[in-house]
A protein has these predicted regions:
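N-terminal presequence-like segments and the immediate start of the first folded domain
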Residues: 1-62, 66-79, 85-310, 316-368
C-alpha cells in the first residue's frame, strides 16, 4: 500500500444491532478495504423481506453500493464478496452468484457459503466485501482432468483466489498436486499465502482434507462444514505477490494453555491470525475468553495490538438466537475501541477437524 490514509465508516449512522459494539461498517486503509457483514436490516435493526432470500440479497447489494460511495469508492473496487446464506432451495448458490455478478461484474470473486441459520429470525443472508482501488486483473484457471477451478483477482501487490471443487475425487491424494499446478499457472506460491479458509460440503470431504498435508489449516479450524449446494469444496485464499510471508504457531512459542491454537502469518504490511480452542472441554463463551486473551498475547509478542486489526471474522457453532451471537460477541467487543475494525460473526454447521466451538480470525496492517 502506497498510502496509509485510514477511513472508518461508522456503523450506527446506518443501522443498529441489538447489542452495543465498537465495529465499523467499512474500513479503508490505503488502497485496501474491508466491510462488516452486510445484512438486510432496517435502520432500527429489523429484518427486511423476512424469509425471502433473493429480495434480501438485492437489499444487501443496494447497501454495499451506497456504503462504498460514502467512502468515495466505486463498485469496481470490489475484489471478493463472501455471500453467507441459508439454503432454501437447491441451486440457491448459482442464483446468488448470477445476481451478484450481474451487479458487480464477472471480474469479482463470489463465494457462496451456506450457514445453518442466522442470529435474527427471518434473516437469510450476510455478505462480506473485500476490495482494492488499484487496477486489477481477473483470470480463471481450470484443471482439465479434474475440473478443479482457481479464480484469481490480482493487483500488482495482492491476489485474492477462490478454489472451487464440484466433485472431490474419492482418492484425494492427487488433489494437492492439482492445486499446486493451478497456483503455478496463476503465478502464486505458498510462500506468499497470507490467509486461507476452507469450506467442505460434506463430512467426508472435510475429514479427507487432514490427510493432504498441504497446510496446517486443513487439520484444524481452517475447515468449516457447510451444507452442500452444488460444490464439494470451496476455499478462499489471499496471497502477497512480491513478498514472502513469515508464519508461526504461537501455542508452544508463548506457552499458551493446552488446546489453544494460534497461527500468525505476517508480511511487510499485512498480517493474518487464526485462533481456536481445540480442547473440546469448554463452552463457547469460555473458549472465546481464552482465545481473545491468547490473541492479545500473540499480537503483543509480534509488535502488534488490536488497534492494528482492520477485519475480524468469527465462526461459531450455536443455535439460531441473537443470544448465541451476543454472548461471545460481548467478550470480543471488550478488546476494541471505536472506531473499530469491520467485523463479521455468524453460525456455522461445524468444524469437522477440530473440537472447537468458535474460531476467530484477524486481518490487519502492520503499521496501523
Amino acid at each position: 500500500m502506497t498510502s496509509r490514509a485510514l477511513t472508518f465508516l461508522p456503523f450506527d449512522t446506518v443501522w443498529k444491532m441489538r447489542i452495543d459494539h465498537p465495529y465499523s461498517l467499512l474500513v479503508k486503509e490505503g488502497d485496501l478495504l474491508w466491510s462488516c457483514g452486510q445484512c438486510p436490516l432496517s435502520g432500527a435493526g429489523e429484518v427486511l423481506h423476512s424469509d425471502e432470500l433473493l429480495p434480501q440479497a438485492k437489499e444487501v447489494i443496494g447497501f454495499i453500493e451506497r456504503f462504498l460511495g460514502e467512502i468515495d469508492c466505486k463498485t469496481t473496487a470490489v475484489t471478493r464478496l463472501t455471500v453467507y446464506y441459508v439454503k432454501t432451495n437447491d441451486g440457491d448458490a448459482a442464483a446468488l452468484d448470477r445476481l451478484f455478478q450481474e451487479r458487480f461484474g464477472p471480474q469479482v470473486l463470489i463465494t457462496p457459503i451456506t450457514t445453518p441459520h442466522f442470529y435474527y429470525e427471518g434473516m437469510l443472508i450476510e455478505v462480506d466485501v473485500f476490495g482494492s482501488t488499484r487496477q486489477k486483473r481477473h483470470c480463471v484457471y481450470v484443471d482439465e482432468a479434474t475440473g478443479v477451478e482457481l479464480s484469481v483477482v490480482e493487483t500488482d501487490a495482492l491476489a485474492w483466489a477462490n478454489l472451487r471443487v464440484i466433485h472431490l475425487p474419492e482418492d484425494e491424494n492427487p488433489f494437492p498436486e492439482v492445486l499446486e499446478r493451478l497456483m503455478r499457472r496463476a503465478g502464486l506460491s505458498r510462500d506468499g499465502l497470507l490467509a486461507e479458509q476452507w469450506f467442505a460440503g460434506d463430512e467426508r470431504v472435510g475429514k479427507s482434507l487432514t490427510s493432504m498435508a498441504w497446510s496446517p489449516a486443513l487439520e484444524s479450524c481452517g475447515v468449516l462444514s457447510i451444507e452442500h449446494d452444488g460444490t464439494d469444496l470451496l476455499a478462499e485464499m489471499t496471497f502477497l505477490k512480491n513478498a514472502s510471508v513469515s508464519r508461526m504457531s504461537a501455542g508452544a512459542a508463548l506457552c499458551l494453555p493446552e488446546g489453544l491454537e494460534i497461527r500468525l502469518a505476517k508480511a511487510e504490511n499485512l498480517f493474518h491470525v487464526t485462533a481456536c480452542d481445540n480442547s473440546g472441554a469448554r463452552g463457547i463463551v469460555e473458549q472465546t475468553r481464552r482465545i481473545m486473551h491468547a490473541l492479545e498475547r500473540t499480537l503483543t509478542d509480534s509488535g502488534l495490538a488490536f488497534h492494528n486489526v482492520r477485519k475480524t471474522t468469527t465462526h461459531y457453532v450455536s443455535g439460531n438466537s441473537a443470544e448465541g451471537l451476543h454472548e461471545n460477541m460481548a467478550v470480543r467487543n471488550d478488546y476494541y475501541s471505536r472506531p473499530g475494525p469491520a467485523s463479521t460473526g455468524l453460525p456455522v454447521k461445524g468444524f469437522p477437524n477440530s473440537n472447537a466451538l468458535i474460531s476467530v480470525t484477524l486481518t490487519g496492517t502492520v503499521h496501523g
